[in-house]
A protein has these predicted regions:
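N-terminal glycine-rich phosphate-binding loop and ensuing alpha1 helix
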Residues: 1-18
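Residue-level signal for alpha-helix termini/capping positions
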Residues: 7, 62-63, 94
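Short, high-confidence coil segments that cap the C-terminus of an alpha-helix
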Residues: 12, 66-68, 95-98
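Short phosphate-binding loop-to-helix
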Residues: 22-72, 80-81, 88
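Structural beta-sheet core signal
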Residues: 17, 73, 100-102
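Conserved core of the sugar-phosphate nucleotidyltransferase
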Residues: 52, 79-167, 172
Length: 175
């Protein structure tokens, strides 16, 4: 679904799938995606961070003479992100000159109000503390549940080697 949707949108120069699996590569190609290389197994473990995968992908594509300023990461766990939200995320990235935009939605779970964790003495305390008490969810700072869809400024990513810098914005979507 994600491949078809991305191709149908006509918003991208290339729709590329990065994988280490030849079967997945064959399936991706059959839907119209490009798979110009297979990802190394070392970047396909459960313990591998997305920053490492994205850095490898950007460097590999640049070495293959692909030219792009923005990389849109639409992970297989986010197949139903709407094309309008993809376009909105890209526009927000360009307009604000932030480092990345992540599709996200406001969540009712809030570490300032109704989420707790164990302290050193094994008693519960709020996950995030504020200088003043939060008396209701409505007065707590808004927090976002991130999705696995991001629009990333390539130059900034290469400079910082990570997606989540201090200049990341949410593109709010419906949960």
């Amino acid at each position: 679904h994600a491949i078809r949707s991305a191709i149908k949108s006509k918003d991208f120069q290339s729709v590329i799938v990065t994988t280490d699996d030849k079967k997945i590569a064959t399936i991706a190609k059959s839907y119209g995606a490009k798979v110009p290389f297979l990802r190394p197994k070392t970047l396909s473990r459960d313990s591998t961070g997305m920053d490492e995968v994205i850095l490898h992908t950007i460097k590999k594509l640049l070495s293959m003479n692909y030219e792009f300023d923005i990389l849109v990461n639409r992970d297989c766990t986010a197949p139903f992100v709407r094309n309008a939200d993809v376009r909105g995320s890209i526009q927000l990235l360009k307009r604000t000159r932030c480092h990345a935009v992540v599709a996200a939605y406001k969540t009712h779970l809030n570490p300032y109000f109704n989420m707790m964790e164990f302290n050193k003495k094994k008693f519960l305390e709020f996950s995030k503390k504020m200088k003043h008490s939060i008396v209701s969810r409505q007065t707590a700072p808004p927090v976002f549940q991130l999705t696995s869809f991001q629009a990333i400024d390539v130059t900034q990513f290469l400079k910082n080697k990570k997606m989540y810098t201090s200049k990341v914005l949410p593109y709010e979507i419906k949960a």
